[in-house]
Amino acid sequence: MKEKGRKVIATNRKARHNYTILDVYEAGIALVGTEVKSLREGKASLVDAFATVDDGEVWLRSLHIPEYTQGTWTNHAPRRTRKLLLHKQEIEHLVGKTREGNQTLVPLSMYFSDGKVKVELALAKGKQDYDKRQDLARRTAEREVTRELGRRVKGMR
């Protein structure tokens, strides 16, 4: 029986810190059997992964899926380039945006959706150090405001 819902395999936690997310896409991914088995064990790393558009196809590079422990000589290469499956209009949109410059394709997460592996791919723009500091200061200020409001509601002040 196929599993329903969404089971997250891996997330790229630094992506939202290092990039400003402009647009998000859901893409399928072409895998071999031992890769899927390794992903079912929850083993994958999106840390250095990025996507490129070559000849009208989107490729995910530097994604690390370790070899399946029970695999034999049929095992896969852990860091091989994998094809992402998107609609033609989405690919054309991504080609236009990435050619403008300063924009890149970054995987945010990888998950099972109804038994199929999907990648949440983001069109993103790199952040400068001062942008990261501004975001940190803004989040800290918001946290202080919500904490103070919570105290006032509870009658602590």
UniProtKB/Swiss-Prot annotation:
Gene3D superfamilies: 2.40.280.10. GO terms for cellular component: cytosol. PANTHER family: SSRA-BINDING PROTEIN, TMRNA-BINDING COMPONENT OF TRANS-TRANSLATION TAGGING COMPLEX. Keywords: Cytoplasm, RNA-binding. One of its GO terms (molecular function) is RNA binding. It comes from the Bacteria. Its main location: cytoplasm. The keyword Zinc-finger does not apply. This is SsrA-binding protein. It comes from Rhodococcus jostii (strain RHA1). The keyword RNA-binding applies. Belongs to the SmpB family. It is found in: Cytoplasm. Required for rescue of stalled ribosomes mediated by trans-translation. Binds to transfer-messenger RNA (tmRNA), required for stable association of tmRNA with ribosomes. tmRNA and SmpB together mimic tRNA shape, replacing the anticodon stem-loop with SmpB. tmRNA is encoded by the ssrA gene; the 2 termini fold to resemble tRNA(Ala) and it encodes a 'tag peptide', a short internal open reading frame. During trans-translation Ala-aminoacylated tmRNA acts like a tRNA, entering the A-site of stalled ribosomes, displacing the stalled mRNA. GO terms for biological process: trans-translation. HAMAP family: SmpB. SUPFAM superfamilies: Small protein B (SmpB).
